[in-house]
Curated annotation (Swiss-Prot):
Lineage: Bacteria, Pseudomonadati, Pseudomonadota, Gammaproteobacteria, Alteromonadales
Complex and partners: Homodimer.
EC number(s) stated in the UniProt entry for this protein: 2.2.1.9
Reaction(s) this enzyme catalyzes, per UniProt: isochorismate + 2-oxoglutarate + H(+) = 5-enolpyruvoyl-6-hydroxy-2-succinyl-cyclohex-3-ene-1-carboxylate + CO2
The protein's role, per its UniProt record: Catalyzes the thiamine diphosphate-dependent decarboxylation of 2-oxoglutarate and the subsequent addition of the resulting succinic semialdehyde-thiamine pyrophosphate anion to isochorismate to yield 2-succinyl-5-enolpyruvyl-6-hydroxy-3-cyclohexene-1-carboxylate (SEPHCHC).
Record text on cofactor binding: Binds 1 thiamine pyrophosphate per subunit.
Magnesium is among the record's keywords: yes
UniProt-listed Pfam families: TPP_enzyme_C, TPP_enzyme_M_2, TPP_enzyme_N
Name this protein carries in UniProt: 2-succinyl-5-enolpyruvyl-6-hydroxy-3-cyclohexene-1-carboxylate synthase
């Protein structure tokens, strides 16, 4: 292969980048069409170690990559052309940065001489993601730059990264080689001669050891910490942290475990899952105010009542366990932060508390709320909370559950049922936007083909409508449950001072339904208005090998009215 040709050298650099990323652990590459990224696109087309995913909209593509990275627990590469194509990744990059999800953006770019001079589709791309991505700027491919220098640059940029990396790749024309040789990384190429050993192996050129800072308390510190009335709080926890170990820890110490919607433990029968509602239950709140020690795993709590409880309580000792060095406490409590994941921290030598079982009455109160929700939600009027509970109760071991922002995730946090088993649960609660939710769910479903359910609001679905094209490409079950209350009815729960203002400037009623959208993308579609029909449609959709839509139409005030009614019941308990 001749390397003096610009198009050929561009292609070699693209192939070196993708080969090294595959060796580092990347399994998926998400690609949008474009000309300036051609060296990366052609290299990806021949790369057999990566699974390719294509979509025409970079915003949805970025969120699909986010879902793939969440599910695979490995970095995912994204290829885009130059210009606003890169900018459209910004929302997904922000979400990934805040939640420590590794995405690797490979953006094609114009060479330096075509920037700031009116050249077509040319913007300043380095630094486009501000502090939400590590930035690497590659020069235009040059035969005088050793290929091993390119590999070590990639290795250093990506190794041990838990957050997004932006690798900006400048290419001069011509971009398209006259012929596409196989393989691109030809062992006979003089340019690749320094990499002969690397080409014959399958490991990265530079192998970085795993870097993980872990800090643990001493046995004496643990003994002093558990000496008193305490609570354990499970915040946002990923499946690989083995959150189930918190159940055993709670039982060993003798402290109640209060669980957030994102903890993987919200429905566990041994946890106090209804904590959001219990904090407005007078007897339960009075009991919880006796606690003077708290052990928090993770952060990004959903319940404002739980956040307020942690902020207002006078803690003798406040410990927080985080896998990364973050500040995840908007209340700025005085505390000791330990760097470890939940599995590591629960494996320490824990002692029985001197006040073990001090809050056992919480179990009774939690059961009271369980019975209240069965009676008033499951056997009450058809509505959003009833559907959320039905999904959470249906075949959980078979599937993964992605819960959309705004009202759906709050309904799950407030009213999820107790269950012997729970689906693996995902959310996008870093920046908590309503964009890209369907695309993220598509990424989750695409990784291994596990049946996946998405609970999403109508405005969120309208926001991500063209990601139905990604959903259409799936060959495994993705059940898209749209809770259509005709607008942003989360604002019914907020103190907007005037109903007309609420309707005109916050709720944004649209009067739309999603049947025609389903037809446009040729997706199976059902609209339901009762629980029996929903359950029949839902079970059928879980068995369908592809994406399907179930639309649940309710009034604008159904959920908010029911929440107000249930709040009244709880407060009078």
């Amino acid at each position: 292969m001749r390397t003096e040709n610009t198009a050929t050298l561009n292609l070699i650099w693209g192939a070196l980048i993708l080969e090294e990323l595959a060796r580092i652990g990347v399994q998926h590459v998400c690609m949008a069409p474009g000309s300036r990224s051609t060296p990366l696109t052609l290299a990806a087309a021949q790369q057999t170690k990566l699974k390719r995913h294509l979509h025409f909209d970079e915003r949805g593509l970025g969120f699909m990559a986010l879902g793939l990275a969440k599910a695979s627990r490995a970095p995912v590469a994204i290829i885009t052309t130059s210009g606003t194509a890169v900018a459209n990744l910004y929302p997904a990059i922000v979400e990934a940065w805040l939640t420590h999800v590794p995405l690797i953006v490979l953006s094609g770019d114009r060479p330096p001489e075509l920037l700031d001079c009116g050249a077509n589709q040319a913007i300043v791309q380095p630094g486009i993601f501000a502090h939400y991505a590590k930035q690497i700027n590659l020069p235009t491919p040059d035969a005088h730059i050793a290929p091993q220098a390119l590999l070590t640059t990639i290795d250093e940029a990506v190794a041990n990264q838990t957050r997004p990396v932006h690798i900006n790749c400048m290419y001069r024309e011509p971009l398209y080689p006259s012929e596409l040789g196989t393989p691109i990384l030809d062992t006979e190429s003089p340019y690749l001669k320094p990499l002969q050993t690397w080409l014959q192996l399958s490991r990265p050129y530079t192998q970085y050891g795993k870097y993980k800072q872990v800090s643990n308390p001493s046995d004496d510190a643990i003994m002093r910490f558990v000496h008193g009335k305490g609570v354990i709080v499970a915040g946002t926890l990923t499946p690989e942290q083995d959150p189930q170990q918190l159940i055993a820890l709670s039982q060993k110490i003798g402290w109640p475990l209060l669980t957030d919607a994102q903890s993987q433990l919200r429905q566990h029968p041994a946890a106090i899952g209804n904590i959001d509602q219990l904090l407005q239950h007078p007897k339960a709140r009075n009991l919880l105010q006796e606690a003077d020690r708290v052990l928090v795993f993770g952060g990004r709590l959903l319940s404002k009542r739980l956040i307020s409880y942690l902020a207002e309580q006078h803690w003798h000792s406040y410990w927080q366990v985080l896998p990364e060095q973050n500040r995840l406490d908007p209340s700025h409590n005085a505390k000791h932060v330990w760097h470890a994941n939940a599995a590591q921290f629960t494996a320490l030598n824990w002692y029985r508390s001197s006040s073990a079982n001090w809050a056992n009455t919480l179990i009774t109160y939690n059961d009271e709320l369980h019975n209240l929700f069965v009676r008033n939600i499951d056997h009450g009027e058809f509505g959003e909370a009833q559907v959320v509970r039905a999904i959470a109760n249906t075949r959980p071991l078979e599937q993964q559950l992605f819960i959309g922002n705004s009202l759906p995730v709050r309904l799950y946090d407030m009213y999820a049922p107790v269950s012997c088993c729970t689906a693996t649960t995902y959310t996008n609660r870093g920046a908590s936007g309503i964009d890209g939710l369907l695309a993220t769910a598509c990424g989750l479903a695409a990784h291994e083909g596990k049946p996946t359910s998405l609970i999403i609001g109508d405005l969120s679905q309208l926001h991500d409508l063209n990601s139905l094209a990604i959903a259409k490409s799936l060959a495994s079950p993705l059940v898209i449950v749209i809770l259509n209350n005709d607008g942003g009815n989360i604002f019914n729960l907020l103190p907007v001072p005037n109903e007309q203002v609420r309707n005109d400037y916050y709720r944004l009623s649209h009067g739309l339904e999603f049947g025609y959208a389903a037809a446009m993308f040729n997706l199976p579609y059902n609209q339901v208005d009762n629980l029996a029909d929903f359950q029949d449609s839902y079970n059928e959709a879980l068995d369908f090998q592809g994406a399907s839509i179930i639309e649940v139409n309710v009034s604008q005030t159904q959920a908010s009215d029911q929440i107000a009614e249930l709040n009244l019941w709880v407060k009078q308990s």
